[in-house]
Amino acid sequence: MPRIVSVKAREVLDSRGEPTVEVEVELEDGTVGRAMVPSGASTGTYEALELRDGDDRYGGKGVRRAVRNVEEIIAPEIEGLDATAQPDIDRTMIELDGTENKSHLGANAILGVSLAVARAAAKSLGIPLYRYLGGPTARRLPVPFMNVINGGEHAGNELDFQEHMIVPHGFESFSEALRAGVETYHVLGELLEEEYGPIATNVGDEGGYAPPMKDTVEPLDVLVEAIEEAGYAPGKEIALALDAAASEFYDEDSGTYRAYGQKYTRDELIDVYKDLVSQYPIVSIEDPLHEEDFRGFAKITEELGDKVQIVGDDLFVTNPDRLRKGIEMGAANALLLKVNQIGTLTEAVEAGELALQHGYGVMVSHRSGDTEDPFIADLAVALGCGQIKTGAPARSSRTAKYNRLLRIEEDLAGAAEFGPRNDFFLP
């Protein structure tokens, strides 16, 4: 098997114009694998630590320390190792770091190497990345969850819920679903401009529009209208989904949620979600409650989990240990999988497989500060989870993933499948 001969890193820019880490891994046969690391805006407390320089460069957000850690600490330890021994390489880096949250070397340093190694190994073997990661049975293309109206930490408007998504699921192929989502997105832009003027079509971090809306139902109403205007059936063909990112509007002092000009207890907020689900074709709600509230997640899952997908993002942070706790308590029924939350490919895949084994849905996700690297597109197909969240069909950091999935579907030809692995939540 091809061995690693060199590991290099550099500071590059993400989609927000902030520094991130890019890693190149070269193998003895001349193959080079390259990977770029994404970065989040609303981050869970228990995420692996992204190492920043904290100096005058880039407002303190430079990543030269992480780059040095790759080249001076990690590289000497993994050069000479078999590139296909992904778990061993990731374990070596975890042990080198020696902390629970990868704060010594930086999760951005470790993850860059982890992903670049996988890509180099796949190229060396002459097989697509999704096939290398998922084996010969990897053929399921994911339903795209498109964040077309941005709020919260992703936009400069007054919407407290962070993401309002369209979910084109009622189609025979990924390419058909993508087309329906794109057409709806553009109709939505026209409707928003008519109602609010050109300012409404400014976009947020993830390519979605950021209109000057103020309440919970306004974005949902216009999404349903856009779906219909685009010629599709709300619910049956294109559903809706929310990412509340509730930790961002939770007040720890009072133990309440402050959203849309009101104060809610946990039970009152759950009632808000129940009302929305009864009125709109919503199939998935992400982070409806605070990231520490496992009992609250169990309660909302018990009350709504037979109707919609309750997704844990900040709750689980792609951490197998936190996921096990959630499974034991019945908290949520789906995992949002972000590779940079945990910091290695091996641990992320472990979390995804653990969720699927216990009947949880899995949605592979980008970050708000992403790059043109489409790694997660291959990962979603490899896991066969049938769900991906990678923003609106705008900005190259988002469309890169959609375009990669189109190529994968073409590569699979007649063998390609489309749709969620766990489809209980779809109407």
From Swiss-Prot:
Localisation: Cytoplasm; Secreted; Cell surface
Binding site for (2R)-2-phosphoglycerate: Q162, K338, R367, S368, K389
Signal peptide start-end: none
Principal subcellular localization: cytoplasm
Co-factor binding details: Binds a second Mg(2+) ion via substrate during catalysis.
Enzymatic reactions: (2R)-2-phosphoglycerate = phosphoenolpyruvate + H2O
Active-site residues, Swiss-Prot/TrEMBL: E206 (proton donor), K338 (proton acceptor)
PROSITE patterns named among the record's database cross-references: ENOLASE
Documented EC number(s): 4.2.1.11
Pathway where this protein functions: Carbohydrate degradation; glycolysis; pyruvate from D-glyceraldehyde 3-phosphate: step 4/5
GO cellular component, one term: extracellular region
NCBIfam families: eno
Family: Belongs to the enolase family.
HAMAP family: Enolase
The protein, known as: Enolase
Organism expressing this protein natively: Methanopyrus kandleri (strain AV19 / DSM 6324 / JCM 9639 / NBRC 100938)
